[in-house]
């Protein structure tokens, strides 16, 4: 199998996909302004090719394109692919778990030759629990992320409050996903979250103090610098032996709005 990654910093999808010729799966990461346009355009260029998409940053070399870029990942080769969606992500994604179970059977998925990639619109903790209830039985690896804007796409159709997923089976050999934490922990900085709002992804306090003030004191920065920290200095949530990156989206008063949910008593 072969993976192709292409990005256009100006949001020109035609340019980004110009070298893609025989995709078996397409992953779209667009910007908020052009997402619907890009979803339609991608389906028009590659009708019938399975695809999933979300709103998110696109990376070109060392440059992060967060506002108006577009990125596409194409997977080629002897692959069996099925894409689908779990709806009602914020309330009852388990209602649609039968779709995932059926799709696993469609591709004859197994631990060594199949992975799952997902793009979620939100409430990822609940969605992941739902997905793992199925994937865990077959030890199928999962990789993905939560996009912005509360919507995702599957095969040219846009869904709000949903999780888009793709099951990929490599018919020529094995396939596996890996993760890498590119951040280093700041020494002696561990906090207990409180006064959180799970529905709005807000952290009110860290160790009993206003979250904004604590964050600024650690980094010795002011209000103006807060907006530049999303990719530089994220918080990390302890999840067993793993650290889950929780990037800060924006400051809301003395609270921090994040890209992932944080609960009271979570260790950061």
Model-derived features with residue positions:
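Small-residue-enriched flexible segments
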Residues: 1-45, 49, 54-268
């Amino acid at each position: 199998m072969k993976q192709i990654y292409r990005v256009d910093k100006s949001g020109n999808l035609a340019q980004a996909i110009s070298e893609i010729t025989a995709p078996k799966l397409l992953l779209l990461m667009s910007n908020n302004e052009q997402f619907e346009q890009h979803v339609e355009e991608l389906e028009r260029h590659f009708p019938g090719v399975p695809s999933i998409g979300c709103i998110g940053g696109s990376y070109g070399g060392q440059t992060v394109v967060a506002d108006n870029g577009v990125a596409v990942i194409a997977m080629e080769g002897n692959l069996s692919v099925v894409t689908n969606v779990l709806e009602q992500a914020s309330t009852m994604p388990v209602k649609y778990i039968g779709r995932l179970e059926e799709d696993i059977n469609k591709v004859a998925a197994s631990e060594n030759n199949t992975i799952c990639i997902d793009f979620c619109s939100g409430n990822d903790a609940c969605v992941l629990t739902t997905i793992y209830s199925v994937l865990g039985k077959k030890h199928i690896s999962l990789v993905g992320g939560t996009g912005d804007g509360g919507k995702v796409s599957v095969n040219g159709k846009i869904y709000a409050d949903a999780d888009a997923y793709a099951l990929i089976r490599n018919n020529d050999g094995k396939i596996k996903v890996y993760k890498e934490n590119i951040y280093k922990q700041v020494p002696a900085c561990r906090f207990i979250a409180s006064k959180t709002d799970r529905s709005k992804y807000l952290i009110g306090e860290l160790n009993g103090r206003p979250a904004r003030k604590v964050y600024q004191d650690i980094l010795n920065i002011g209000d103006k610098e807060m907006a530049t920290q999303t990719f530089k200095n994220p918080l990390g949530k302890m999840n067993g032996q793993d650290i889950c990156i929780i990037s800060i989206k924006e400051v809301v008063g003395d609270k921090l709005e994040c890209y992932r949910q944080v609960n009271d008593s979570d260790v950061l």
